[in-house]
Structures are given as structure tokens and as C-alpha cells.
Amino acid sequence: ACVVERHFPEPLQRADGIEAVLDGLLAEVARVLEGRGQGGRSFEAGLFHTDGQVRRLTVATGRPTRDGAAVMRLFRERIATLADPIDPGYGFDVIRLAVPLAEPLAPAAPDLDGRAAGQEAVADLVDRLATRLGPDRVLRLVARDSHHPEREAALVPWTGGAAGGIGWPPALPDEPPSRPLQIFDPPQPVE
């Protein structure tokens, strides 16, 4: 976990000032996480009012990241979809940014065909949709062990990882297919 915060002698009351402070805190968090070789999966901003109230905003990512701009976009999405908008009132004394969940993040080099960029774009889209709609509303298919072809896959919430499925084993070159290549409608008797 990583926590950084800013204290203000004069309470902060403007929304653009809050975003600027969050940008700075995200840059600090990125430096700390980079030193540890980690990336954040969950980010929590705590906005402390002068009257003692605390407003917390949490965003999560599908993969570890240190990209402050991407996390800031998620915070903007979260703020835009709040039922109760952020009211600074008399202002904020402290803004705290915490990373409660961090995982190892190895440096990644893109493939020669540019596939890494496409995978990152899909992961960013999933993060934005999960922030807008909720993490349980963004689904993906995983393999299941079943003898019925229509039950070979199941919908599960997107987590960004490969967990949750059995994975289809690769076919061996000399092995016949495990089921017919064509399903007849109506079914035909096997002779």
C-alpha cells in the first residue's frame, strides 16, 4: 500500500484545483510504485472537509498501472457519475491518495506487430466501462468443462486476468477432434 497527501493552509474550494492536486498526487504515487516495481490496481482519493466530513472516491483498474493520466480519467468518470456531486462547502484541508492494492508491474515492450497497444486499449476501455457501469456489469467469456457445446463457456465479471476459467487445451497434431466438426439439424443417427 502507498499513501500520499497534501495539506492546505487555506481550504481548497475549486474543482479544477482539486483535479490539479490529484494529478500531482498521482505523479508522486507513480514514482513510489516505480521504485518498488509495482503498479496500482485500486486507487482511493480521500477529500477531507474543514468541518470534519470525508468524501472518498475509489477507482479500480483491470491491470496494474502507474499511468497517472489514465487513472485521472477514471476519477473524472467517477466524479461525473456520482449521484451526489462533490460539494466543497467551506473547502478541503487535506486531499489524500491511497493505493490499497498494488501488484508487481514488469516493464513491457510491445510486440513487433503492435499488439500490446491494442491490448492496452481494450484494458483501458474495460476500466472506463467498469467505472461507469460497475465492475459486475462488464462481462467476459471463460471456458468451462462441459459435454454440451452450448455450455462450453460462461459469462463472468471482467477482472483483467485469466483467472476463473479452465482454459481450452491446445489440440495435438495427431489427435482427432473431441466432438463432431458439424452438428446436424435435425440430428442424424450414428452408424
Residue ranges and their predicted role:
Residues 1-191:
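Non-catalytic peripheral regions of nucleotide-handling enzymes
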